[in-house]
């Protein structure tokens, strides 16, 4: 800062220089657009000096933050969604990078419907896809294989042999009339149905009027003479065993005569002796309250054994 100092050491700043400091120059930036911009002084970039008090808030903190007018559209928002800011060459390059939102089946259907006779060869389908969608011009190996797979596996595409009077190579592909209604605005909604699902879709017993369709799928009526049935002896034995367990919970008085005699304290049950270890009876004078505990140990072996031969 330039100033004038006298011999006594006091300095003063000229009035014109004070006004120049209060209003800094614009440094020749008036050639930019007239939109509102945010100017940051050097004080905002440098660290704040140490101060003893809080002091007033800086003046640049209340400055209006505005986006330059050159980045705003006519409506005040970013107008880049319609790609108007891109040149024609830039838009074409963007179309080469973005994949079209159509499935391969939709591309095939679009190509077939664009033909005058509604039929095209495989090479003509390739030409249609590559000519109308620049994305598929880069690599042809991947999507061409997908086109062939969709033609072979999708039931909506039918192969038509070439006539004898029609010279050329390859068969024609046409669209099934039943599937034309399912093609709407490039969205091929029909999904390929597997052959296994088609065979399983038939409901068994639907042709019989007696209402056999209520039977579960895969179940066939069994002949009681030919199909094996559970053993009657095993069922009777388990039924008797369940009855004995219910009676045991109520007390020994409700047990049958044979089981009550087997579960006595003087003699262990003969069927449990062959399959479970016996507990020696050291106290022949047990009270009736101890009988359930002593017998319950041997019955636990019968309950948790899974061989099925203990009863």
Swiss-Prot record:
<dbReference type="InterPro" id="IPR001766">
    <property type="entry name" value="Fork_head_dom"/>
</dbReference>
<protein>
    <recommendedName>
        <fullName>Forkhead box protein I2</fullName>
    </recommendedName>
</protein>
<dbReference type="InterPro" id="IPR018122">
    <property type="entry name" value="TF_fork_head_CS_1"/>
</dbReference>
<dbReference type="GO" id="GO:0043565">
    <property type="term" value="F:sequence-specific DNA binding"/>
</dbReference>
<dbReference type="GO" id="GO:0005634">
    <property type="term" value="C:nucleus"/>
</dbReference>
<keyword id="KW-0804">Transcription</keyword>
<dbReference type="InterPro" id="IPR036388">
    <property type="entry name" value="WH-like_DNA-bd_sf"/>
</dbReference>
<keyword id="KW-0805">Transcription regulation</keyword>
<dbReference type="Pfam" id="PF00250">
    <property type="entry name" value="Forkhead"/>
</dbReference>
<keyword id="KW-0539">Nucleus</keyword>
<feature type="region of interest" description="Disordered">
    <location>
        <begin position="188"/>
        <end position="237"/>
    </location>
</feature>
<feature type="compositionally biased region" description="Low complexity">
    <location>
        <begin position="219"/>
        <end position="231"/>
    </location>
</feature>
<dbReference type="InterPro" id="IPR030456">
    <property type="entry name" value="TF_fork_head_CS_2"/>
</dbReference>
<feature type="region of interest" description="Disordered">
    <location>
        <begin position="263"/>
        <end position="294"/>
    </location>
</feature>
<dbReference type="InterPro" id="IPR050211">
    <property type="entry name" value="FOX_domain-containing"/>
</dbReference>
<dbReference type="GO" id="GO:0003700">
    <property type="term" value="F:DNA-binding transcription factor activity"/>
</dbReference>
<comment type="function">
    <text>Possible transcriptional activator.</text>
</comment>
<keyword id="KW-0010">Activator</keyword>
<dbReference type="InterPro" id="IPR036390">
    <property type="entry name" value="WH_DNA-bd_sf"/>
</dbReference>
<keyword id="KW-0238">DNA-binding</keyword>
<feature type="DNA-binding region" description="Fork-head">
    <location>
        <begin position="99"/>
        <end position="193"/>
    </location>
</feature>
